[in-house]
Amino acid sequence: LRYAAGIVKPLPIPSPRTVLFRLHWALGLTAGFVLALMGLTGALMSYEEAITAFANRDRMRVEAADRVPLAPTALAARIDAQAGGRIVNALTLSDDPNASAFVRFARDPETRVRPPSVYADPYDGAVLGPVRLEAAFATVRDLHRWLLIPGGSKGWGRTITGACTLALIVFLATGLYLRWPKIHRWRIWLKPSLSRPGRPRWWSLHAVAGTWLTPVYLVIALTGLTWSYPAFKDGATWLLAGPSERAKPARMAGHGEASPVPDSRPDAVDRAWAAFRAGEGQEAGVVTLTLPGADTATIRIRWLPRGVASLSARNEARYDAATGAFLSAEHAADTPLGRQILQSILEVHRGRFFGDLFALLFCLAALAMPGFAATGLTLYILRRRATVPCRRRAPGGASPRGG
């Protein structure tokens, strides 16, 4: 209530547009800066593989000459002998004879922490050195996912980033509503007016860039929520693949506990590898062989066709850990689109699922998030500066505007 000359007047009820506008800038002053940090770290991780490959270019190459590569079990045994108690969990091999092997170790059974990965010579098993920048990108990933707050995925950091991801969807919805023109002119809607001075220029840049990037941010937000909220992931799984997919166990090694491996034999791995190389492996480019152990109860071979780099085209075959007999295979070409999206949710999140051009677009969109925080803060400050003189001139100190 406002009191003026003894008369009580009710405060005007703000319009929906005013409420949404205040919600937009209030979230911008809070969640906006967390999203800016998530955008920067996400953009950096968009090209993690390329950056890591450049930093390790000397360790990723070996001299093949006329040497014959070791069988997987022999290669793993030689690496284990140099690893100081660490056990090889997976080998990534290439059809390029001059490419080194990428070696991932099994998690520590007590701490569940995975030791640093290394590169190794596939011909003699010599360890060429650890993967440079792996630890740095692990820190960037933790910063992106839960802000390095103690507790990791079970702490408050995941709650905060999940809430900020929801805020991004609110930004998109309220921004489009507030910007929806009374006069529909595509030139005004899609082209920024940078020649206008002051607040109009910043508003035009903020609004037009947001309009262009709305589809990208929507994909980023919706896929990001699958890591933040299990219920949302279950709903997305049901929508994309049907209810039967929800009952399947986790496919990724290290996610949950697998059943113990009964009577696993080293020669079974070599049999499975030989069968794969004689069959579908003839057209394989990059192959990841996951050995049976505490994390995986079968021999799993995942591969990309020769000349293909997108993980969304990855195929998979499974073999019995005791005999090396073929169990099942799954090919990307035969997988329905919904399941492809679920199995490559990270690639969708990064834009690589749609091709290299979209990967670059998603990276640039992530880099633009700090720009939205900066322009939004600039608009807020300029608006507050313009509002204070108006309040001083208004009778009784009342603001002439509801915003």
What do the predicted segments below correspond to?
Residues 2-403:
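Conserved histidines in hydrophobic membrane contexts and catalytic metal-binding motifs
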